[in-house]
């Protein structure tokens, strides 16, 4: 069996990073709203493309979001969505 046939485990476990991701996303969201953009569309554009031009420099939002890996942002968004919407 080649190494391409094996499932790799992807794991994040740093709770302080989770808080940081939340703070960054909220700051970026607020900055986008203040500048008159649709925050959801702009954040999705950034996550899909990796192009920081989707995020304004206002409130240092562009620099903050670039300090995080996009997969960290996506992980936090998925985790938050599932925790909010999973059935009991």
Swiss-Prot record:
InterPro entries: IreB
Matching NCBIfam families: PRK05473.1
Family label: Belongs to the UPF0297 family.
Name of the protein in question: UPF0297 protein BPUM_2379
